[in-house]
Amino acid sequence: MIRLTTNFLAAALMAAGMTVAFAQDDAEQPKPERQSWSFSGLFGVYDQAQLQRGFQVYKEVCSNCHKLSIPFRALEDPNGPGYSVDQVKALAASYQVTNDEPNDKGEIFKRPGTPADDFPPPESFPNDQAAAAALGKAPPDMAELAEARKYERGFPWFIFDALPFDQYQEMGADYIYAILTGYTKTGDTQWDLYYPGHRIAMPQPIVDGAVDYKDGTPAKLDNYARDVAAFLSWASEPTLPERKKIGLRVMIFLLVLAALLYFTKKRVWKDLH
């Protein structure tokens, strides 16, 4: 009995120690803060001007290391960046892409891109193996980043996030914004407040003044991070506005159906009450 009690106390102390350790880890590893996004909530939509600025940041900064596996013509999306057909044609033609089929001599060759082509990988890293050999690990595909980097907000926030008129799902955008603004230790370009362990392989990619916005928006890190996070959210989920419209229609249908069933029940059973 004494041994059993001793073992129980030892286990309890160990569990308490682990709880304290985890609490300390959580305290040292803050979660990204919830940001305000035009596309969050039941009625959220993408801000076209913001997506165009975000694409500019991707093109001038992020594309040096990260691929973006979407076709050029996706940029014509009226619910997305909304570029014109001519703009997309000119953009695609400015890239050299590898042709799917060899020429008459059996040689693989490159040609100017067309709107139907996907964005090519960075010139320095034509494939994941080359990127991994140079960097130690292949940088993630930016078309998947916002979805892949979603995180749990914990209790009680996940309850509020699930409310019908909130439906907050933009944790991936929050994460991207947090990482880009988390390089807060002077003199250490690989220390990030929000990255697990605070050591990140990617040196700080962007600072104030790195990109001159075409629309005159202030060239500040906060704007860069917010705009590219919005663009990458669209790249990960371009059908978001349409999905939200469908969800709203379903909710309205269910409310009307519930009302009809309620009044039908009252009419059918009125003589028995």
Q: Predicted segments — roles?
A:
Residues 56-67, 117-125, 138-147, 178, ...:
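C-type cytochrome heme c attachment motif
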Residues 41, 71-72, 85-118:
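Acidic/histidine-rich catalytic neighborhood
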Residues 1-10:
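Bacterial N-terminal signal peptides that target proteins for export
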Residues 18-23:
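Sec/Tat signal peptide C-region and signal peptidase I cleavage site
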Residues 243-248, 252-273:
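Juxtamembrane interface at the cytosolic side of transmembrane helices
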Residues 137-188:
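Acidic, glycine-rich loop-and-strand cores that form catalytic or ligand-binding grooves
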Residues 29-56, 67-85, 216-218, 225, ...:
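Electrostatic cytochrome c docking/interface patches
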Residues 194-196, 200-237:
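Extended, hydrophilic extramembrane loops/domains of integral membrane proteins
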